[in-house]
Curated annotation (Swiss-Prot):
Lineage, highest ranks first: Bacteria, Pseudomonadati, Pseudomonadota, Gammaproteobacteria, Aeromonadales
Signal peptide: none
A Pfam family per the record: DUF520
Protein name: Nucleotide-binding protein ASA_3207
Family statement: Belongs to the YajQ family.
Function: Nucleotide-binding protein.
GO molecular function, one term: nucleotide binding
Domain of life: Bacteria
Annotated organism of origin: Aeromonas salmonicida (strain A449)
GO cellular component: cytosol
């Protein structure tokens, strides 16, 4: 029986490239001349550091633009609150990896309510969709692409 997996992953090497591009843009921007500001990637989060809170907001927008250029959706970002320590401001941006239980349940309910003839099963941090016809699976894919679930979804292991 044909099947595929729905996953939510962020490629960290693309995030690294986006952070490097954002740091390069910071170095060339006129409004950041003479300001100590930087992006730093630590495992699964990006640390933003600047002299003022408004600069952090600008840096988040720079990071969003760099991520979009690398085909990473903004909905995969969790932007934390800015923290003031000494004369510096810090902000952490985390990336959503895997599908959380609540979102997986919403996904299963969405597909089952649509009356498409497929079976849906939650398998850890991914969702497996199985059906008799390839057309039913493609219809389920289109349904998931159109749904706003708060994080980007990718499709893997499409088997006939």
């Amino acid at each position: 029986m044909p099947s595929f997996d729905i996953v939510s992953e962020v490629k960290m090497n693309e995030v690294l490239n986006a952070v490097d591009n954002a740091n390069r843009e910071l170095a060339t921007r006129f409004d950041f001349r003479g300001v100590e500001a930087s992006f730093e990637l630590n495992k699964e989060e990006v640390k933003l550091e600047a002299d003022a809170d408004f600069q952090l907001k600008q840096m988040v927008e720079i990071l969003r633009a760099a991520l979009l250029k690398r085909n990473i959706e903004n909905s995969s970002m969790d932007v934390g609150d800015s923290v003031h320590s000494g004369k510096r401001f810090h902000l952490n941006v985390k990336f959503k990896q895997g599908i959380e239980k609540e979102i997986a349940k919403k996904l299963v309910k969405l597909i089952k309510d649509s009356k498409i003839k497929v079976q849906v099963a939650i398998q850890g941090d991914e969702v497996r969709v199985t059906g008799k016809k390839r057309d039913d699976l493609q219809e389920a894919m289109a349904l998931v692409r159109g749904a706003e679930l708060g994080q980007p979804m990718q499709f893997q292991n499409f088997r006939d």
